[in-house]
Amino acid sequence: MAHQLKLLKDDFFASDQQAVAVADRYPQDVFAEHTHDFCELVIVWRGNGLHVLNDRPYRITRGDLFYIHADDKHSYASVNDLVLQNIIYCPERLKLNLDWQGAIPGFNASAGQPHWRLGSVGMAQARQVIGQLEHESSQHVPFANEMAELLFGQLVMLLNRHRYTSDSLPPTSSETLLDKLITRLAASLKSPFALDKFCDEASCSERVLRQQFRQQTGMTINQYLRQVRVCHAQYLLQHSRLLISDISTECGFEDSNYFSVVFTRETGMTPSQWRHLNSQKD
């Protein structure tokens, strides 16, 4: 078995007293599977890519939020102008008396959902705090570490307030049309999605929405939905015993032959080849 790449604290933190830092990825390049001896929050600002976390693939774009524990293994592939920030932290160095475990899914290896989404309002507020945190964590002045940890606590609570599951934007949300579209697409894994109907409901221009989506994500709406469905199919092929025809239906493809064509085009192998290759990992 190939040696597992592990990222180390000493390469990312200025001292053994520093609990929090910010690592920019402008843009994020392809990055081989790795683990860390620290934890991180990942926020995607724009573009798209394939994020594989603990063998589960996610097609990521603006607004995606991940809570990564040190022992988690993840990688980035098929990136397209993918811009994100990693807020890295060492749980054992945090001194602030906050309910970290209640606010951070997976904190200290506790059970928790790693993938969430942020709407435009949450992203704007998070970006402002992260900017302050990045500045403070790079300072070599008295109380810089303490200030950085205070800002990290503010960020964690802000994310807790604004995050939502990928397919269920709160009905009272004041998020933008683009946020609502991405949420609707995530909720359309099994069912057909009609953009014209969505635009009628939202009283918006289909052409303008298509342009806005592509500008922010680097993909067309159809490309994004297709790749989200293929990612779900990859997960089911590896972690379930469903027949390929049933997986096709679960992922919104009415015709299993068409599903196989799309899957092969996106991944470079047939669904059965994917299942055989990845079943050897379990």
UniProtKB/Swiss-Prot annotation:
The keyword Cytoplasm applies. Residues 179-277 form the HTH araC/xylS-type domain. Transmembrane segments: none annotated. The keyword Transcription regulation applies. Residues 196-217, 244-267 bind DNA. It is found in: Cytoplasm. One of its GO terms (molecular function) is sequence-specific DNA binding. The record marks 246 as: Interaction with sigma-70. Its main location: cytoplasm. Coiled coil: none annotated. Pfam families: AraC_binding (PF02311), HTH_18 (PF12833). Keywords: Activator, Cytoplasm, DNA-binding, Repeat, Rhamnose metabolism, Transcription, Transcription regulation. GO terms for biological process: positive regulation of DNA-templated transcription; rhamnose metabolic process. GO terms for cellular component: cytoplasm. Binds DNA as a dimer. Activates expression of the rhaSR operon in response to L-rhamnose. HAMAP family: HTH_type_RhaR. This is HTH-type transcriptional activator RhaR. It comes from Escherichia coli O1:K1 / APEC. The lineage of its organism: Bacteria, Pseudomonadati, Pseudomonadota, Gammaproteobacteria, Enterobacterales. The gene is rhaR.
